[in-house]
């Protein structure tokens, strides 16, 4: 109450920001007459003038009014479009690192040119992020004319582009691309074995178009690059033999009394969640059995960090044998396990269960076990976009998620007022008892609109619902178009014409997004086709264009008189924001329009959250079949249900981020170390530090710190140094011939002897030649151990929730154990690198070059690379990299780094698809 009172007096934070921005708008408008007088050359010259002023220390904020005035003037000349005042306000919000909420049709693409130009002047690059390749290409081409006129370069970053083209795109002042491709490029840059193969040049400033879709809807699915992992075939077979030796417990133990178990056993099953859990007795038995088979040392625990993968394999084997049944969950066909869809009963050829379950089922059935794919690199959008020095975004609907943007990304949302007030009539929802009644009412409304010539856009939440409406409209004999967010370029053309008289268009939420629906249809494409037709004379062309414009004017006036575009939806999405996006497709820039949602008690959202309340109202009113309830209380109940779902989804995303932040901190350390290794001209200091650390650990096993001579095992130390590290030292003789020698002096002698042995080795081939070998050894060790670490974190994450039963905080336990695993990773890298450096025998520089090349080939020679990323429709898409696909064994073909790439580009493999590995 007090907050509302204060807001009325002082205005909201949004009002105060807009007031502040409008003062700057007045300054920009005052400059317009002067800039109009400039020649094209003088206007373009402003860009260099601004760059010089930045070089002399002037800030981008100080340049903003002049830079915005230049862009507006350039747009008037090149695009024949003048930025509205509200677009200048939106541009300021974007420049200051905020999210600009601008309604559909308010010209977000043109608004973005203002902050993009201003920030590109710094020379550090600007990334414009779109939801699909079509929009990236369209906007780069469309707005590129303006940037090029003003003297800036524009690049476009697309999937499967050769490395040289990607590097050129990132070197441009402004780069357009999709969120997935930017993320994958970042991951691939941190997998290269040559610094020259990196494509990105730093993450300076990003403007994310449809920011809600990218940073919220797709944030639950990480970007993952996978490849063929280490072969664990023998382990799957061994674990399959352990399972029959474990007995299932019958009955569930009461947590307070421990009663309820009718037959004690080693594991319990939860068939609802398809999970299996070992009992205390089961842990002991499993450890005993695994020790007897030599899989773990005697007396070792199943949950020792070293055995973490064994736990994963044991659980996979138990699930495969007790929860997944032949001819119910899968069938065996041609020696392969084929999954059966539990809902449709169809065979899902080519699909595989993850987390080693598929391999465990293969071991159970005795068929050929196919190698497991391993995560090579992964990152969530939350953590990728937080790497930018400055981030901003724009969308038609951000205000409902303003809290999440602030909480997760530190981004404030500014609601930009429309250029003209909206005339759209958002009608109350109509709720029917059954799905059949709902669809009948929706079809009747569509028919009515079609008969009077009013265009209709039917919005659905899924492809399945689109197909139902499609079938019903076919039966009703109503002509229509269906869009499912699959073919972006074609769908953009169809959506652009969705405002023509009598048009019926069915679209899922994402289909055709980013394209305006103009009342009367979009005539510009037809005009562009005429202007490109060289067979027409100038007079014919002009006459045809005039005809088209006259026809469009008639159509536009007709549709406007009929009430504009009608939006009909057959289901509420679980997010209010998605519903608002659908409504926002109508009533653009002050056009008329209307929207209505047709719902039923059978809809998922209604059934789970709001159904009982609405059903009670219907029963009280004794409503007959076919009658709908249409009341504010119902609409409010539904919106309340949506708020509950949004809150739940926010909690899921926040929890995902809290867990991923642990991996993210570690990822930053590994990637920073990796980049330093790639860029360092000399790696001697790093190698020396690793060797000293490693040998200190070895010495302390035999000569404890601050110990006396009687506690030392010098014979054991001499033997270990000679056998494992090839360091020969007569320590016992030295101690005998010395009056007093300390443990620190022993350590120094060992480290000095190792340093001399190593330098002698380097001296044989020269330090310069040895550096590249050191680089490959370090990179390969970091990469191999990092991949294993990612798998270990996955396994740890899967079972960490069980710590809650032991009255422990799962998140804290995860952080603690993940840190311990990371410490082990660093120790393992030190050991591996030092051992290899000390034991390698170098005869000549040619031999060393050969070894270096072999290591680089092995490091980059990952097979079956795949890229997993979220799609606009909410699914996860996995794309295989053709160049790294596994070859049939009989073929025996291995692509060398300098061989022609198998994709047929004519480039060397290492310069084409080889870099993707």
Curated annotation (Swiss-Prot):
A Pfam short name: SEC-C
SUPFAM superfamilies with a match to the protein in the record: Helical scaffold and wing domains of SecA, P-loop containing nucleoside triphosphate hydrolases, Pre-protein crosslinking domain of SecA
Catalysed reactions listed for this entry: ATP + H2O + cellular proteinSide 1 = ADP + phosphate + cellular proteinSide 2
Binding site for ATP: 87, 105-109, 516
Gene Ontology CC terms: cell envelope Sec protein transport complex; cytosol; plasma membrane
Record localization: Cell inner membrane; Cytoplasm
Alphabetized UniProt keyword annotations: ATP-binding, Cell inner membrane, Cell membrane, Cytoplasm, Membrane, Metal-binding, Nucleotide-binding, Protein transport, Translocase, Translocation, Transport, Zinc
Membrane topology: Peripheral membrane protein
Quaternary organization: Monomer and homodimer. Part of the essential Sec protein translocation apparatus which comprises SecA, SecYEG and auxiliary proteins SecDF-YajC and YidC.
Function: Part of the Sec protein translocase complex. Interacts with the SecYEG preprotein conducting channel. Has a central role in coupling the hydrolysis of ATP to the transfer of proteins into and across the cell membrane, serving both as a receptor for the preprotein-SecB complex and as an ATP-driven molecular motor driving the stepwise translocation of polypeptide chains across the membrane.
Family: Belongs to the SecA family.
Name of the protein in its database record: Protein translocase subunit SecA
The species this protein was found in: Acidovorax ebreus (strain TPSY) (Diaphorobacter sp. (strain TPSY))
Annotated gene: secA
């Amino acid at each position: 109450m007090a907050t509302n009172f204060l807001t009325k007096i002082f205005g909201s934070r949004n009002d105060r920001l807009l007031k502040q921005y409008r003062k700057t708008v007045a300054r920009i408008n005052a400059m317009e007459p002067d800039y109009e007088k400039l020649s094209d050359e003088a206007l373009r010259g402003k860009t260099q003038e601004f760059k010089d002023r930045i070089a002399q220390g002037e800030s981008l904020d100080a340049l903003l009014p002049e830079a915005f005035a230049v862009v507006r003037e350039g747009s008037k000349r090149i695009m024949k479009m003048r930025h509205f005042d509200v677009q200048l306000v939106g541009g300021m919000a974007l420049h200051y690192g905020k999210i600009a909420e601008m309604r559909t049709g308010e010209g977000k693409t043109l608004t973005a040119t203002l902050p993009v130009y201003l920030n590109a002047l710094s020379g550090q690059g600007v990334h414009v992020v779109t939801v699909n390749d079509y929009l990236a290409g369209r906007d780069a081409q469309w707005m590129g004319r303006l940037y090029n006129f003003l003297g800036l370069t524009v690049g476009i970053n697309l999937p499967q582009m050769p490395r040289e083209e990607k590097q050129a795109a990132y070197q441009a002042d402004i780069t357009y691309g999709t969120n997935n491709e930017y993320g994958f490029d970042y991951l691939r840059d941190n997998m290269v074995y040559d610094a020259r193969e990196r494509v990105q040049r730093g993450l300076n400033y990003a403007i994310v178009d449809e920011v809600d879709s990218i940073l919220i809807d797709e944030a639950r699915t990480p970007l993952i690059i996978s490849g063929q992992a280490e072969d664990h075939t023998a382990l799957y077979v061994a674990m399959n033999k352990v399972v029959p030796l474990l007995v299932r417990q019958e009955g569930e133990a009461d947590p307070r009394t421990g009663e309820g178990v009718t037959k004690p056993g080693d594991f319990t099953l939860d068939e609802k969640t398809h999970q299996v859990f070992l009992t205390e007795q089961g842990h002991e038995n499993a450890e005993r059995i695994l020790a007897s088979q030599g899989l773990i040392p005697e007396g070792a625990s199943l949950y020792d960090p070293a055995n973490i993968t064994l736990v994963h394999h044991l659980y996979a084997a138990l699930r495969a044998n007790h929860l997944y049944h032949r001819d119910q969950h899968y069938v065996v066909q041609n020696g392969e396990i084929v999954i059966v869809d539990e809902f449709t009963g169809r065979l899902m050829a080519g699909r595989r269960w993850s987390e080693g379950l598929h391999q465990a089922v293969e071991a159970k059935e005795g068929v050929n076990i196919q190698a497991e794919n391993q995560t090579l690199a992964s990152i969530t959008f939350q953590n990728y976009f937080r790497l930018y020095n400055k981030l901003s975004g724009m969308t038609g609907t951000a205000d409902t998620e303003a809290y999440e943007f602030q909480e997760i990304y530190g981004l404030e949302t500014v609601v930009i007022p429309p250029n003209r007030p909206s005339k759209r009539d958002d009608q109350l929802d109509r709720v029917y008892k059954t799905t059949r009644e709902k669809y009948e009412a929706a079809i009747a409304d569509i028919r009515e609109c079609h008969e009077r010539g009013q265009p209709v856009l039917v919005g659905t939440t899924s492809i399945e619902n689109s197909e139902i409406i499609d079938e019903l409209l076919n039966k009703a004999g109503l002509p229509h178009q269906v869009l499912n967010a699959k073919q972006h370029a074609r769908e953009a053309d169809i959506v652009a014409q969705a405002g023509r008289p009598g048009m019926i268009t069915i679209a899922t939420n994402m289909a055709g997004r980013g394209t305006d629906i103009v009342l009367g249809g979009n005539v510009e494409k037809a005009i562009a086709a005429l202007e490109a037709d060289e067979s027409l004379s100038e007079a014919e062309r002009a006459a045809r264009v005039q005809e088209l414009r006259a026809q469009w004017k008639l159509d536009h006036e007709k549709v406007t008189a009929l009430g504009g575009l009608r939006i009909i939806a057959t289901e509420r999405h679980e997010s209010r924001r998605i519903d608002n996006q659908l409504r926002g497709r109508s009533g653009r820039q002050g056009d008329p329009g209307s929207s209505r949602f047709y719902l039923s008690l059978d809809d998922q959202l209604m059934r789970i959250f709001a159904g009982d309340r609405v059903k009670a109202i219907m029963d009280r009113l004794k409503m007959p079949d076919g009658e709908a309830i249409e009341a504010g209380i119902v609409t409010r109940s539904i919106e309340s249900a949506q708020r509950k779902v949004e809150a739940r989804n926010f909690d899921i995303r926040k929890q995902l981020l809290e867990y991923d932040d642990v991996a993210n901190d570690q990822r930053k350390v590994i990637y920073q170390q990796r980049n330093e290794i790639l860029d360092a001209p000399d790696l001697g200091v790093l190698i020396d530090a690793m060797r000293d650390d490693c040998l200190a650990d070895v010495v302390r096993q035999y000569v404890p710190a601050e110990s006396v001579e009687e506690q030392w095992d010098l014979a054991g130390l001499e033997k270990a140094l000679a056998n494992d590290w090839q360091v020969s030292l007569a320590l016992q003789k030295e101690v005998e011939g010395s009056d007093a020698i300390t443990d620190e002096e022993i350590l120094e002698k060992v480290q000095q002897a190792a340093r001399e042995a190593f330098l002698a080795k380097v001296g044989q081939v020269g330090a310069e030649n040895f550096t590249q070998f050191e680089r490959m050894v370090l990179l390969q060790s970091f990469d191999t151990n990092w991949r294993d670490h990612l798998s270990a974190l996955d396994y740890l994450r899967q079972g960490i929730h069980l710590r809650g039963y032991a009255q422990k905080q799962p998140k804290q336990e995860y952080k603690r154990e993940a840190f311990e695993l990371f410490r082990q990773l660093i120790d393992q890298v030190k050991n591996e690198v030092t051992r290899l450096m000390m034991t390698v025998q170098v005869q000549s520089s040619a031999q060393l070059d050969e070894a270096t090349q072999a290591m680089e080939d092995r490091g980059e020679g990952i097979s079956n690379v795949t890229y997993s990323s979220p799609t606009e429709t909410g699914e996860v898409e996995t794309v295989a990299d053709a160049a790294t696909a596994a070859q049939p064994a009989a073929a025996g073909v291995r692509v060398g780094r300098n061989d022609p790439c198998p994709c047929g580009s004519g480039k060397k493999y290492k310069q084409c698809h080889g870099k993707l590995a």
